[in-house]
Amino acid sequence: MTDTATGVHSNANGVEKVPTPVFSIEGEPTQETAPTRMDPFDRPKNDNDPFEDALKRCHKILEKLDCPFVTGKEKDLDESDDMTENEDHDEMANEDDGIPSNEKKVETRKMDCTSGQLLAPKLPEKAESISSASESSEDSESVAILKYTVRTCYAIWKKRQKNSEIALKGLMIVLELCLSQPSARDDAFSALLETLGYNTVTFWKAVVPQIYNSDLSYATQYREALLFSLVLYDVNHSKNRLRELYAAVPGVRQSMLGIRAKQFGERYRHLQMKIARSRASSRMSSKMGSEENLPAMASMMNDVVFDEEPHTQSPLVDMSHDKQRVINVSNAPPVSISRKTSGSWEIKQGSGGLVACVDPVMSADKKNIWLSNLGVNMQEELKEHSTSTNSLGLPLIKQACAGEVFCVLERNEKKEELTPKQQAVESDMSLLSVLNTYNKHSYQLNPVVVNQDDYNTYYGGISNGLLWPALHNLPQYISPCFDDPELLREQWCAYVRVNYLFAINAARNSRAQDFIWIHDYHLMLCGQIMRSLESSLDIGFFIHIPFQPPANFMTKYKTVADPIMRALLRFTKVGFQTSRDRDTFVKLVAKHIKRTKIEYDSRLDRYTIEHDGWTCSLGVFPVSIKIADFVNIAKNPQTIIEAEEIKKQIMGRSADGGQLFFSVERFDYTKGISEKLRAWQRYFEKYPDRIGKDVLFQVAVTNRRSVDSYRQYQDDVLAVADLINQKFKSEDYPEWKPVIFETDGLPRTRLIAHYLAMDIGVVTPSKDGMNLVAKEMLVCNPTASLVLSTGAGTEVQLSNAQFYSEQEGKCYHRVEEISNTEAFADNFFAAATESKETRTKHGEKINQFLCVHDIDEWSDQFLDPKWTHEVISQCEVKQLGQFYGLMSRTAQVRRQIVECVLKGLPIRPHFRYSLENAKNSLESSCKSGTKLSLEADEESGEEKGFEITYDIHDELSEMEKDLAFLAFIQSDEYENAEEFIKTLGSFYEGGPVLFKNEVKQAAEMLQQGIHYNTFFTDRDGTLKSYACSYPTSVQPAYSAVIQAQFARRCATFCAIVTTAPLLHTGILEVATIPEGYYAYGASAGREWYLNPAQQFKDRSFSAIDLNLMNKVFDIIEELLERPEFRIFKWIGSGIQKHCGHITIAKQDVNGTIPSRKVIRLYEQLVKIVNDFDPNGTTLTMRESDLDFKIYVKAKLKGRIFNKGHGIRLVRERLKPNMSKGNCLVCGDNESDIPMLEECLKLAGSKVYTIWVTADTNLQEKVTQLCDRFSCSNIHFVSCPQVLLGAMAYATAHTLVDERNRKLDYYYDSDTPMDQEESSTLGASLGTSFGN
């Protein structure tokens, strides 16, 4: 047999075995003895136990290394081989893939080789080594050999010296054993990973090719076993070691998730849409009217489809994605599958709480996908795999077992006697055919097929043997077999394995825009596993049962409990049925999971927990029912007639005044049926006058009879029911029975008829997630009374809604503790004697509440992203820290928007909600118009009572533009760019017409340059209007996209040169363009940033000068702490320390600071500069409209470093060729003139320049400067949005020109295009904001 999760082969007895080895480790194979293909793992040729073989081979390796394992003698590793030395660890693992560099290192250990016990110093606690407590004494030495082999071989291999290849073979022997028995040897695999430490990436690079070779030659399927082993390790240790494998072999992740295929499918679909749109024009319809062109057009996009970094490799990308789907994942399917006597498969709509809850959501869109196990799994069969190579040793195309899973869905037996027509009928009867038919008329139902043994262990073991009773706080029903740690570990491996299969199926079926919804306790690990496969997935989890584990759950069952708690924190959001369940989870996290940050938002009733770099939102969502379905049946005349007949049939044998108590549930020990019957018995003992009157009609649908605990419980309950009927009889009504007990389920119509017939509904579970029966009862029959236990989630919901309070009245009969038989019996009596008027009054109140809070509300609220941490919540902004924090979060959201647009990814609704909430928060916090008054907080360091007022007109306006941009960017309209430019005109003070004319004139000049070899521009005032404060001058998403697209389509080297610093309230914190489009020249070009690996600074000033500037900065900071000058910290750029100068804001954009205050600040600054530099040799001070700047003079000539010097610096370091090609320069004030002058010196008349200014003096200076260099390409615009509109317009028309040129070439030329031309055309066939 083959484990579908790991690919491990087993014999008929279930013992795992490795394929027959072909290459001995004794020495290199000779020509006479060498096999056709060499075994990369050097396995000996025998059928012995693989564990024993591995031990023998370990001994041989150790002998070759002259480090034999000696029994009874301690063996110390040489100190020079200490595993804490990781100086040669792989840099890619340590940096590029984010592997923590501060991870605890493995210390050298001594080992008692007689007992196999580990002596001090020990491994770190995180390293889960093989526990001697769980091993038999005869295995202890064998385990010690494996560990010793790993440590010895690693110490030699990592030095890359003599015998390193032999040492690597030793490590591979241990690895092979782990992969051949992944469930039995997970502890050895953990020890191997911990020993390798930072060298795992290097190790995988060396070993994975051998694993692939083994799979190809011997059908070992070790690749799948390796993936599962890493998943199991990550789950058990809360790590992500899978990323190390991705770093070593990037193709592994892509093949696992089918990334290439999904990308191609998306792009191909979009290309078809574009072709369809293009056919609307007469020219395209005549030349593209034939479908024969479609494959040719698809081939044009091949290169574009597979770009790993679209924002640096491909032009504008398409945003016409499919809308978000829901990928629903559950253990149980929404259908019931059976095979008729004729042999054909039949699919019927399933029943149960999960189906009732989720089916309305799934049915809303046929593209939604439901993944579940259909009960058709891999059977335990011994299969001899056919050879995977031919007679020449070459690999066969189709490996053994390649179609094994699909055979499960088809009829396995071949009926050769059937005619072709009969075989076609037989095919139509196959399960696969039935599923396909089902999917045509509903959402997509995809089966998850697993090994049947694994499924049985996962379902009957951890899921229902441990988690089900534990989470219901019924420890007495936990299977005693889990007291054995070894058995618990084995069953836990099966649980992980099945979760892994569900997770990888869900990841493969999902797209970036989809929401993946995991359900219930069977699949608690899926979130963590899926996030290790693809970290950007949006995954939610809802637990339908209670979360009330016993007190010892986290200690006695730590093997299971700890990983599950950590795994739940990897979901984006987790939903609970009740606040009681959520509070229990939060308390357990706070107590048992270290390094967590827990926050509660009372307005949203949301907990947010941060752990290990992941954030999870916890909410409460009481499940409900589809009201209309029940009400329609209840109001049906036929149902009403049937209810009357039921009432007459049952109560016709009772005395007048009798009450019909009705209860329906699964025959489960969590439902409190046993306690209910004992209370019913006590009821008649306490109140004998009710004998002969009241009847309890109990429906308990039998299930899980194969589980011992269930079978015993059900038999005991039935015995109690018989005892009650024998004990209580009425002489006046001899046919009366106190209990009517049914074990068969009722059809929905019949069930609702019983709801109408009952007088009192009884729902008294010991623990239940919600229990929808109670809601069904009062929705159908609002005149009925309800006996409800506190164990039901419905009771918690009704209690929280004040339906059981002194103020609102007690609208139901609450059973506090079902084990309290006396009180339970009293509740029965109170319900039986309650007046009909009171009963109706209370029932109708609950009925109205339930009709409002139906199933649609439940699913809508859970699926709504607004309540999660990913969306900025609406709040009142009162303090400076809140304002800056809110704007910082909008910067994060805008970066995500820009990245999605540039990469062609779908725009998630989270982004719009976040910007809307941020905008509404600011607007509602303004006291008058756009004036926002803020007070000091602890983060600002200010005293209480200090208040500052900002005019946030720019911040609000930019958010409004971004919201409009989001609406246009998701449009499929061809001219969405042009339409958005028109929308920008609505924000223009001069009106849309004037804006359009300005944009057109500026765009015409931009188009004259056709393509710019270099592009240098200022930011604030040029590309971005001035904000009230630099920390709030976040670059809008629309602006970032326009600039990025212009840089990609219209220029070669682009740089933003600004006087702001890089960090510490600098350009990198407020910019939202991804790396790769622009270089940033901060501090007037004195410090440059392209990416983390490319940064450089000006070194023209000495350390003494820099120290002097730092002292001046400290004194100015102290000055601005004084109350009369404090205002200058919070306006404009505040106080900033740059590379080579200091900036101090003197005025805001609205000119609200009185001139007398500005003069006093100026005088103080002059005094400080003169005190430190009385001769003026080092420092100099300059003044602009909004700032004071104190510069360190250039080293040689005492000049101020300006943007012209910054251009020189970048030319020296990056060497852009400015003498060839056109150069574009944009600015808005005099500090930008040196930048223009430097470019004119280099490019002369090839310079094109646009200035954002209405200042005639500045315009004259720019014009005169250009005249000096015979440059006439000058244009002035009134505001940044005009410049951005011109850039967008020029970009769009550049695309149109290129598209037309390519299409003319394609259709008018008989010469086929080469690959580069083909991919360029395919990439150019798109909308202006889309590819």
Swiss-Prot record:
The broad enzyme category this protein falls into is transferase
> Recorded E.C. number(s)?
2.4.1.15
**Ranges annotated as biased composition (Basic and acidic residues):** 39-50, 102-112
User: A single Gene Ontology molecular function, please?
Assistant: trehalose-phosphatase activity
Catalyses which reaction? D-glucose 6-phosphate + UDP-alpha-D-glucose = alpha,alpha-trehalose 6-phosphate + UDP + H(+)
Q: Which residues form a coiled coil?
A: none
Q: Which UniProt keywords apply?
A: Glycosyltransferase, Transferase
Chain spans, region Disordered: 1-50, 71-118, 1312-1331
* Mutant lacking the gene: phenotype: No visible phenotype.
* Compositionally biased tracts (Polar residues): 1-13, 1318-1331
Q: Do you know which Pfam families this protein is assigned to?
A: Glyco_transf_20, T6PP_C, T6PP_N
Output compositional bias ranges, type Acidic residues.
77-98
Q: Which InterPro entries match?
A: Glyco_trans_20 (IPR001830), HAD-like_sf (IPR036412), HAD_sf (IPR023214), T6PP_C (IPR049063), T6PP_helical (IPR041064)
Q: Which GO terms describe its biological process?
A: trehalose biosynthetic process
Gene3D superfamilies the UniProt entry points to = 1.20.58.1800, 3.30.70.3080, Glycogen Phosphorylase B, HAD superfamily/HAD-like
Origin superkingdom: Eukaryota
Q: What does this protein do?
A: Catalyzes the production of trehalose from glucose-6-phosphate and UDP-alpha-D-glucose in a 2 step process.
Family note: In the N-terminal section; belongs to the glycosyltransferase 20 family.
In Swiss-Prot or TrEMBL terms, this protein is called: Alpha,alpha-trehalose-phosphate synthase [UDP-forming] 1
Q: State the organism of origin.
A: Caenorhabditis elegans
